[in-house]
A protein has these predicted regions:
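Structural microenvironment flanking redox-active thiols in thiol-disulfide oxidoreductases
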Residues: 72-125, 162-163
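Short loop/turn microsegments at loop-to-beta-strand junctions
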Residues: 33, 55, 200-202
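Hydrophobic alpha-helical segments, especially N-terminal targeting/anchoring helices
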Residues: 38-40, 206
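Catalytic metal- and UDP-sugar-binding loop of GT-A-like glycosyltransferases, i.e.
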Residues: 60, 93, 206
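Residue-level signal for well-ordered, solvent-exposed loop/turn and beta-edge residues enriched
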Residues: 30, 43-44, 211
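Short active-site neighborhood of thiol/selenol oxidoreductases, capturing the structured segment around
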Residues: 46-77, 89-90
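N-terminal targeting signals for export/organelle localization
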Residues: 1-38
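Thiol/selenol-based redox catalytic cores and closely related redox-interacting motifs
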Residues: 117-216
Length: 216
């Protein structure tokens, strides 16, 4: 089931219209792409044009269905005061529709500026890849994690927050952590997962002139 589900997700994403290079994240020295997204914890929209003149760190995450991304957003909130004191704005783009995101963060507020991008267009514009699964028997060289065989993905084991009793396969770890958090995916979360389940994450520091200064 896992094999067929992820091949379907990967095929669906591959048919979409990507903005920018979907497998090569922007690098230092390159111009940050234009974006304008609705704010989750503010009124109105936030855009690159509106941020010009101020350096900012932007994190591009999966949706709320991903327990690892929920934790990374919290961690980003912990470093926000230090970044703010250095004159750097902190933004997090989450792959969840606006109203669903607002409901969640109403009860779990964060000091960082949250933006909603259910279509992952900003992720694509910054070149943040999704996992592309190689056909079975392919001679292409895997480039983990952006390009992998299904066998490699199924064999992977993760426990980055050390909350699990032992490292688990990525999708299995999602289920365990969501259960630990008491987080139940609703229809909106399920739809986002079905469309963007293989999306990866990225962080970019953009200077006051709109140029990428650091990327991870």
């Amino acid at each position: 089931v896992l094999r067929s589900n992820f091949r379907r997700i990967s095929d669906d994403i591959a048919k979409g219209n990507a903005v920018g290079d979907p497998i090569r994240p922007l690098q230092p020295g390159e111009v940050a792409p234009e974006f304008a997204l609705p704010a989750v914890n503010l009124e109105g929209a936030v855009s690159l044009a509106g941020l010009r003149g101020r350096p900012f760190l932007i994190g591009l995450f999966r949706g709320l269905h991903c327990p690892f991304c929920r934790r990374q957003v919290m961690q980003l909130g912990h470093v926000q005061p230090a970044l703010q004191s250095a004159g750097v704005e902190t933004l997090a783009v989450i792959n969840t529709p606006l109203e669903r995101a607002r409901l969640y963060f109403r009860y779990r507020p964060t000091p960082i500026m949250l933006l909603s991008d259910p279509d992952c267009r900003t992720h694509q514009a910054f070149g943040v890849p999704h996992i592309e699964f190689l056909p079975e028997g392919s001679s292409e060289r895997p480039e983990w994690p952006a390009r992998a065989s299904m066998a490699d993905f199924e064999a992977a084991r993760v426990n980055p927050t050390r909350e699990l009793p032992e490292p688990l396969q990525p999708m299995a770890s999602n289920g365990v952590l969501n259960a630990m958090d008491g987080f139940e995916l609703d229809e909106t979360d399920q739809a986002i997962f079905a469309q963007h389940g293989t999306q990866l994450v990225g962080h970019f520091l953009v200077d006051a002139a709109g140029i990428v200064a650091w990327a991870q």
